Amino acid sequence: MALVSSLGFGTYLGECDDAEDARYTRAGAAALERGVNLIDTAINYRCQRSERAVGDAIRVAIASGTVTREEIVVCTKAGYIPLEKTPPATREDYRGFLDSEYFARGVMSAADVVAGGHCLTPRYLDDQIDRSRNNLGLETIDVYYLHNPEQQLDSVDRERFRTIMRDAFETLEKHVKRGAISSYGCATWNGFRVDMQAKNHLSLEELVTIAREVGGSKHRFKVVQLPINLAMTEAVRTPTQRLGSGTVTLLEAAQRLDISVVGSATLMQAQLTHSLPQQVKAAFPGYSTDARRAIAFAQSLPLTAALVGMKSSAHLEENLARPAIS
């Protein structure tokens, strides 16, 4: 896999329309040309439009001659059932969509779905991987995440959850062997940040153990993702992970288990782009904007990359700005 830029290009937010697609395509191509080579998306983002815009951006950047496919790290996710281009107008329309697109085709059953729209069964993952490859226009996806697997714990007990994850990891190892993905991981929201006694807690040590059981010592479970920012510091400060006989932070557990960490919500959906306290500004001198200070905080941590959503050249330039040296 290519050396990864410390800033990653995120594609979560935005309207489900052609204009937003075009903005993401332009910004993504520009980011690749400026050396931002990690792109993060998910099949459910913007009703599959984000994946397709990423594919367009990659093709534009490669055609310009400024980057090769081998220099790009593409990450996507599966778990939440993706819609097609626009959300259904009614609940009945959504049920009809599930029936025709998934249930009738045998991709999954209604019993496989939790929380109204989350699934991690092997047949469903088979389907989603090939859909994502088609959306992205790629033979191989570099990093394939299970999207918020802790969502399952709202509906199943811990024993059943382990079986779900084992089956999912076996499926992903199979797709590594066929060349559809290079590695896999878990992209989470709450799972790695909550207390160990919480119902939706995820144990990184347990996940690595499952990966070793199904994939051996050369398993391809390599990356986890979670929110890490100035306001959400659990990965750095809170010992949420049991490792051996002790408890450690997620970042320490990942380092000791040889798992890469990607930080999401770096700007907390623009909430950290303004009104930061004076002590934060003092801690990151030389930066002219709060957005850049928030990014600098994430980049100061032992992360593989910090993700930031970008849809304009102005935001790209701001996010890449180097600190002034006095």
Identify the residue ranges that each predicted region occupies.
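Short charge-dense sequence patches
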Residues: 1-9, 114-125, 241-245
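N-terminal binding-site loop/beta-alpha segment at the start of enzyme catalytic domains
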Residues: 1-100, 107, 139, 156-159, ...
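Short acidic capping loops at alpha-helix termini that bridge into adjacent secondary structure
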Residues: 68-72, 139-143, 183, 219-223
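Active-site gating/metal-coordination segments in enzymes
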Residues: 84-145, 151
